[in-house]
């Protein structure tokens, strides 16, 4: 049987998608070869790539004046690519700091520009939270404002989209496609694929057309969004299989009823899990309710010494990858789009049984 996979990334993929990929692996649509072996310049592959983009545009309702790029190097490469692409005419940017991933982004940006760090991570009644925008020291003349919507490691998520004057840039790696989003509020959106989009090796960048001419002169051509946009994200050979598989995920999402429909399921999963944790004396979640992530649910046990036993027994019950990030410890259940409601229900049953036996 397939286990329930709560990994933060590379994450669970829909079983139907994996089955279709398996079925097409050796002989893609009767062509006598795998799509992995196909030239990225061939008419067949270009059609696959174009359909993936069209389906993503449909899912996210992406306006015409935005380019969608299918790039390589993970979201971490974009920590450099973004300032190199956007600080060519104005060297100043604001970075909102709420956790480990936004910190990685701002540290990299400091190598290329004059970065104003907005400290927005706070504690409310002992729980981690994000401060009100009225308390932020935003610049009047920033080229852009950067934030990470969902801190995958901490399980901390913005309750809404910040309202700023400068173009808004956001790392949506662990929350893209999990809830409806007004793309027109952003100058640039980026996301590593390996959580809600597809397998590792692909990064999506959605950029408004007017920002394509802001690059620094010294930017490597492979990182230049304008060059990638002109060349259909194929300045060099793209991650063809990851692009294809992501296209299958987009098809699957459309079949589920799109982002609105999957969002309802995601809310149900999150409410069930947080509801159980809050009702328990044995488990604790460290995040203030308004800023709880609907994708990444961290929790601790009443006795830290039981963690290894919890993970071992969880694995024996086909509940995988529940260890928290090495930097923070504890547990974390990542409940992305492909994790079914039944998986969360099975996790809660196990957690309840474990607490009764060890509490």
Swiss-Prot record:
Location in the cell: Cytoplasm
Cofactor dependency: pyridoxal 5'-phosphate
Keyword terms, alphabetized: Amino-acid biosynthesis, Aminotransferase, Cytoplasm, Pyridoxal phosphate, Pyridoxine biosynthesis, Serine biosynthesis, Transferase
Binding site for L-glutamate: 41
Residues binding pyridoxal 5'-phosphate: 75-76, 101, 152, 171, 194, 236-237
Reaction(s) the record says it catalyses: O-phospho-L-serine + 2-oxoglutarate = 3-phosphooxypyruvate + L-glutamate; 4-(phosphooxy)-L-threonine + 2-oxoglutarate = (R)-3-hydroxy-2-oxo-4-phosphooxybutanoate + L-glutamate
Any single GO BP term: pyridoxine biosynthetic process
Gene Ontology MF terms in the entry: O-phospho-L-serine:2-oxoglutarate aminotransferase activity; pyridoxal phosphate binding
Pathway: Amino-acid biosynthesis; L-serine biosynthesis; L-serine from 3-phospho-D-glycerate: step 2/3; Cofactor biosynthesis; pyridoxine 5'-phosphate biosynthesis; pyridoxine 5'-phosphate from D-erythrose 4-phosphate: step 3/5
Keyword Cytoplasm: yes
Cross-referenced InterPro entries: Aminotrans_V_dom (IPR000192), Aminotrans_V_PyrdxlP_BS (IPR020578), Pser_aminoTfrase (IPR022278), PyrdxlP-dep_Trfase (IPR015424), PyrdxlP-dep_Trfase_major (IPR015421), PyrdxlP-dep_Trfase_small (IPR015422)
EC id: 2.6.1.52
Sequence positions bearing N6-(pyridoxal phosphate)lysine: 195
Cross-referenced Pfam families: Aminotran_5 (PF00266)
GO CC annotations on file: cytoplasm
Cofactor note: Binds 1 pyridoxal phosphate per subunit.
Record family assignment: Belongs to the class-V pyridoxal-phosphate-dependent aminotransferase family. SerC subfamily.
Function: Catalyzes the reversible conversion of 3-phosphohydroxypyruvate to phosphoserine and of 3-hydroxy-2-oxo-4-phosphonooxybutanoate to phosphohydroxythreonine.
Binding partners and assembly: Homodimer.
Designated name of the protein: Phosphoserine aminotransferase
Origin species: Acinetobacter baumannii (strain ATCC 17978 / DSM 105126 / CIP 53.77 / LMG 1025 / NCDC KC755 / 5377)
Lineage: Bacteria, Pseudomonadati, Pseudomonadota, Gammaproteobacteria, Moraxellales
């Amino acid at each position: 049987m397939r286990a329930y996979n709560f990994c933060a990334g590379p994450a669970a993929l829909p079983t139907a998608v994996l089955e279709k990929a398996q079925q097409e692996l050796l002989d893609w649509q009767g062509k006598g070869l795998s799509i992995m072996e196909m030239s990225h310049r061939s008419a067949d592959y270009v059609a696959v790539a174009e359909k993936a983009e069209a389906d993503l545009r449909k899912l996210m309702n992406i306006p015409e004046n935005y380019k969608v790029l299918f790039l390589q190097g993970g979201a971490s490469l974009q920590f450099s690519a973004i300032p190199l692409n956007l600080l060519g005419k104005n060297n100043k940017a604001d970075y909102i700091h709420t956790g480990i991933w936004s910190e990685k982004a701002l540290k990299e940006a400091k190598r290329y520009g004059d970065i104003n760090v907005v400290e927005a991570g706070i504690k409310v009644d002992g729980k981690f939270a994000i401060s009100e925008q009225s308390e932020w020291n935003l610049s009047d003349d920033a080229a852009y404002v950067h934030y990470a919507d969902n801190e995958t490691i901490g399980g901390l998520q913005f309750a809404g989209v910040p309202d700023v004057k400068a173009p808004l840039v956001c790392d949506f790696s662990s929350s893209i496609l999990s809830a409806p989003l007004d793309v027109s509020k952003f100058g640039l959106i980026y996301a590593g694929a390996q959580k809600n989009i597809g397998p590792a090796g692909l990064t999506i960048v959605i950029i408004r057309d007017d920002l394509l001419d802001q690059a620094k002169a010294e930017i490597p051509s492979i990182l230049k969004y304008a060059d990638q946009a002109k060349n259909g994200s194929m300045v060099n050979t793209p991650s063809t299989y990851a692009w294809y598989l992501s296209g299958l995920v987009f098809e699957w999402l459309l079949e589920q009823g799109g982002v609105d429909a999957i969002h309802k399921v995601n809310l149900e999963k999150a409410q069930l899990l947080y509801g159980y944790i809050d009702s328990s004396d044995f488990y604790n979640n460290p995040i203030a309710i308004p800023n709880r992530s609907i994708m990444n649910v961290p929790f601790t046990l009443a006795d830290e010494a039981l963690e290894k036993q919890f993970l071992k027994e969880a694995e024996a019950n086909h509940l995988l990858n529940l260890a928290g990030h090495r930097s923070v410890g504890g547990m974390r259940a990542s409940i992305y789009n492909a994790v079914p409601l039944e998986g969360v229900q099975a996790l809660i049953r196990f957690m309840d049984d474990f607490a009764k036996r060890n509490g």
